[in-house]
Amino acid sequence: LCAERDALRARGIYRGLGLCAFIELTTPGPAFYGVGGARISSQDGCTIKLEPSGKLICLTGVTEQGQGTDTMIAQVVATAVGVRLEDVRVLTGDTMVSPYGWGTWASRGAGIGGEAALQTGKALKENILKVAAAILTSEPLDLDLRMGKVVDAATGEARLDLAELGRIAYFRPDTLPKDFQSELTVTRHYVP
């Protein structure tokens, strides 16, 4: 750029070089919209359910606009729960089934939607480990979920495949302790 500037200057054309810094407001919370009475949701929700196949379905109020929101949500969920990325299916944009939110607006997907997905994923993992503990007659704290398998938390030894856990929880609850409730669909909302 400097060489081009100098060449133009030699011909009597004066151009400079400039630098501009800009900060865009993103992920505004309730105080931003609520005080003005705008009917704009400043929170977002996420629902994740474990299918009997061991795969996860994630419903979120944020939407994909070409900036990778679906992939980001899938990565957050896979990491929070302890499954492979390819085992997470993200569904967006269906207001009949997804938790209430206000979409992406191109700059709030990760900040609000990603946090809702993280909180939901952590809660689902906790519930999955409770089911696994009931199946394995163990304690939830002695187990972990890694790459879609319930493992011994101390040794990493595989104890139960997530698909088998799903099969038992959905189709053989009679083999679980009396009055045990498998909560394998979780919804959480995040308000910044």
Model-derived regions, located:
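Cofactor-centric catalytic regions
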Residues: 1-57, 65-80, 93-192
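Short acidic capping loops at alpha-helix termini that bridge into adjacent secondary structure
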Residues: 84-89, 141
